[in-house]
Amino acid sequence: MKAAKKPRTPGPKEGLSSTVTEPNRSVGNPSFRRPPLDEVVFGIRFEPLGNFTIPFFGLLWQKFRSEYPRVEHAPPLTAGTTLAVDAASGAPLPRLWFVNESDDELVQFQVDLLYYNWRRREKEYPRYPMIFPKFEGAKNSLESLLVELAQDPIVIVAHELTYINHIPQGQGWDTPCRRRCTSCA
C-alpha cells in the first residue's frame, strides 16, 4: 500500500518554482473579444542581489536596449519596510524602467524585482500567449547577465500577475458604493 503524499505548504521561499508556465486554456476561462484590459504585469520578487552595483544596471540595459531603447527612473518599490541601498554610499538603489519605442511595453528592474508590463496604447491586447514570452525573455536576460558577471543566481520569493481593467461608468456599473454593500442607494 502506498503512503499518501503529504500536501505541500509553500512558505516564503519553499515551494516556489523559478519556472512559470502558461495557463491551461481548456479549463473554460472566459475570453472576451474586446477585454477592458488596460495593463498586464508579470513579475517576480527575489532575494536582493547583494553585489549588483550601479554599473551593472547599465550592463543590464545593454541586454534590453534593442527592444527597450528608453530608460526612465522610478521610485524603488518595497516589500515591507526594507529598501535596498548601496553598501558604499547608503543611497537607495534605483528602480529602472526600460521602455519600448511605442510606449506599450516596459521592463522594470531593481535589485529585488523584475516586472514586465504590457500597457494599452494604440494596439489591442495581444493576449497572454503573446506577451508571457516577453517576460520570460527579460528574466532570461537578467539570469544570463548574472552568469556573465559570476553573480549568484536569483532566488525567487514571489511570482506576481496583475491585470488592470478600465471599465467606464455605465458599462457594468453605475454608482460607486461608499461602503461594502449588496446594493447602492
Predicted regions and their residues:
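Aromatic/basic-lined ligand-recognition segments
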Residues: 10-19, 27-29, 95-102, 106, ...
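N-terminal ordered "arm"
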Residues: 11-81
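Glycine-rich, often proline-containing surface loops adjacent to acidic residues and nearby aromatics
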Residues: 36-44, 106-125, 153-166
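Short amphipathic alpha-helical segments
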Residues: 52, 56, 60, 127-134, ...
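Long, hydrophobic/aromatic-enriched structural stretches that serve as scaffold segments
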Residues: 71-128
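"Short basic amphipathic alpha-helical interaction patches in structured regions
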Residues: 128-134, 150, 176-178
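Secondary-structure boundary elements
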Residues: 133-155
